[in-house]
């Protein structure tokens, strides 16, 4: 939210991308695409049913969000005990919230960015100690907002990003996927790993991002 606030004066369409993302269209086509869709919100929604694991993420508190529990196994055990205790005592929060989930990488209009900023108190109250809350807050808020009807519904994913959730979490694109990426109507793609697939990354950069 604060990152969006700092960027408010920079551009009308705000893109949230990571270092594992690359453009898969020429810069002029990306610019033309967003200019042709100036009032659309590009937000991904998980098409799969809400799983018991996701229920656990949003309805119970996870007390060590800022700690990598894989490196601190004792805290991982404590976290599991606290989680089991909440279930045993039926301490289930947020039961009045209809959660939706998707990728945290999105592009949005200035209007929706400002709308998100007005919801900071709600985010802190509802999503504090939620496990990976960045996969819930944008989708949940936009689905219950005046911007719901502005979600992009054109070719490809609603986020304008080619992300393969069927083969991975997400799938790391391979060189064998190059033709699939070239045929995609999306503007960006993720996830790329230059250590594992340097040939693919360099080819994508050569085709679509020679300035990088």
Predicted regions and their residues:
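Active-site rim elements
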Residues: 99-103, 123-129
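Membrane-proximal basic amphipathic "stem/tether" segments
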Residues: 57-95
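Conserved donor-nucleotide/metal-binding helix-loop-beta segment in metal-dependent transferases, i.e.
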Residues: 24-59
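Single conserved hydrophobic/aromatic residue that forms the stacking wall/gate
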Residues: 1-9, 13
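C-terminal catalytic/acceptor-binding lobe
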Residues: 125-212
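Short beta-strand-to-loop acidic/aromatic patch adjacent to the donor-nucleotide binding site
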Residues: 14-19
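A recurrent flexible, glycine/aromatic-enriched loop bordering the glycosyltransferase active site
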Residues: 93-107
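Conserved nucleotide-sugar donor-binding
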Residues: 104-120, 138, 146
């Amino acid at each position: 939210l604060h990152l969006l606030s700092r960027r408010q004066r920079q551009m009308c369409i705000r893109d949230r991308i990571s270092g594992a993302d690359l453009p898969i269209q020429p810069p002029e086509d990306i610019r033309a695409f967003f200019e042709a869709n100036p009032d659309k919100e590009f937000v991904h929604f998980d098409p799969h049913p809400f799983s018991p694991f996701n229920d656990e993420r949003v309805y119970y508190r996870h007390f060590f969000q800022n700690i990598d529990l894989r490196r601190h196994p004792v805290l991982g055990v404590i976290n599991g005990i606290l989680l089991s205790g909440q279930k045993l005592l039926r301490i289930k929060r947020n039961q009045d919230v209809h959660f939706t989930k998707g990728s945290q990488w999105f592009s949005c209009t200035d209007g929706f960015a400002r709308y998100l900023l007005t919801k900071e108190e709600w985010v802190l109250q509802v999503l504090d100690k939620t496990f990976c809350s960045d996969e819930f807050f944008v989708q949940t808020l936009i689905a219950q907002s005046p911007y719901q009807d502005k979600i992009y519904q054109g070719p490809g994913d609603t986020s304008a990003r080619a992300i393969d959730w069927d083969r991975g979490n997400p799938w790391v694109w391979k060189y064998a996927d190059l033709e699939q990426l070239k045929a995609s109507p999306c503007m960006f793609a993720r996830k790329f790993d230059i250590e594992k697939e340097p040939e693919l990354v360099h080819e994508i950069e050569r085709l679509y991002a020679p300035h990088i």
